[in-house]
């Protein structure tokens, strides 16, 4: 069988080896002379020093692991020769010498590598600047442990870079991010994760950017100040404490947005103080107004809670056709009436997390929390045609809300209900039928129940 496989063309064998880990692919070099240099035809090299800690043989010393890893990387790069590399991934937590790391990076850069993915323990040392001078890189990922420091004279254009991911990266000063982004004229996707205190004041100004993901959640340190000057952005995924500020929000052609504000006890107390609360909510309003052109919008429970505090200043979402609301038992729905009124073209509404929420007097007609004669007409005026309920548990309160939606959403044509897996057994259904809503009459609405309430 080995001989039959060995007769295949080199490029085909290289493709087969690329389906293995780099460590497994390198081991095939001992099969025969034919296989010795086939690693050169593998365009994807991925090195992870954790693979050298074999639990079956007992943990090596840190120094032993480091040296074994170094020898392996050196050997593979030597066998690879001058062959082109498409992807180079390096996960190194054992403290390899910085000069050696730089040597490996320069090696793959000289061979026109397209994708580099780095995560390493540099301590207080700064990583090599050569990586920011590549004219071939299409995607760059810098993960935990990477520390960046360079001056204007150390960075040239990264003309081919399309995707940049920075996760838990630290910087020598607050202007580093802007300098890096200014060198990426073709960047289309930017991912900033675990921002913390790395760049408390940052401006993302990229005309070519299409997708932006920011995860900025730190329970300590100052609030962040983000400016978005991305007129051609299509997709925004933003997670942050809602105390952040947004001096500039230029998102004119935004199509899809996910806004996830994180609430803490400290922030809830601050909002309760009128002066602090008004200031923080005015900052939130800047971002919400900036995304008002979206067609598809996702709001987390925390975001829904925050919007309830400033619902009177909520903008009109003239283009919005698809809205996802994630709820929870401790979240009030006071934002829902205004939100639904301000979506004149809404076609699909998805409610995740079930329908049970914190009872409040200001939910209007969005729910059945409190019974009163006049609660508004936000549902009746909403043009939504399709309603989807996720994590439905079948409580009496939820059953009443389904009935409420059925009769109050006047344009409704279809309702899909997804029963939550593992729902508590004490939640007895109102009917043993697979569809307990057949008794609802008078409307031409299709109701589909996914999962069992029995």
From Swiss-Prot:
Keywords: Leucine-rich repeat, Repeat. The keyword Repeat applies. The keyword Repeat applies. CDD domains: F-box_AtFBL13-like. PROSITE patterns: FBOX. Residues 2-48 form the F-box domain. LRR repeats lie at residues 77-102, 144-168, 169-194, 214-240, 270-301, 303-327, 328-353. It comes from the Eukaryota. Pfam families: F-box (PF00646), LRR_At5g56370 (PF24758). PANTHER family: RNI-LIKE SUPERFAMILY PROTEIN. This is Putative F-box/LRR-repeat protein At3g58880.
